[in-house]
Regions:
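Polyanion-binding surface elements
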Residues: 1-17
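Arg/Lys-rich, alpha-helical DNA-contact motif
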Residues: 3-4, 43-80
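Short alpha-helical "recognition helix" segments of helix-turn-helix
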Residues: 7-8, 21, 65
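Conserved hydrophobic/aromatic packing and binding residues within compact polymer-binding modules
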Residues: 18-21, 52
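Short helix-start
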Residues: 31-49
Length: 80
């Protein structure tokens, strides 16, 4: 697991942005420590973070990106 700071450095997303993405349900941390509220991310979530960044460069709104990610998850479930 990566702390929000470590994940921020790797993904090139600010910690503020990661907190916002969590708030709107776009990119939820893999784990939030109930004792201190610290957010932790799985290395596999980096793919999602990079996809979000790529879609933003194509001028998709965050709501559109959220829809794309939700449909992607449904497709992956159906294919497994």
């Amino acid at each position: 697991m990566l702390s929000i700071g470590e994940f921020s450095k790797i993904s090139h997303l600010t910690m503020k942005t990661l907190r916002y993405y969590d708030e709107i349900g776009l990119l939820k941390p893999a784990f939030i420590d109930p004792k201190n509220g610290y957010r932790y991310y799985d290395i596999f979530q980096l793919e999602i973070a990079l996809l979000i960044t790529r879609l933003k460069t194509y001028l998709f709104s965050l709501e559109e990106i959220k829809d794309i990610l939700e449909n992607r998850e449904k497709t992956e479930l159906l294919n497994s």
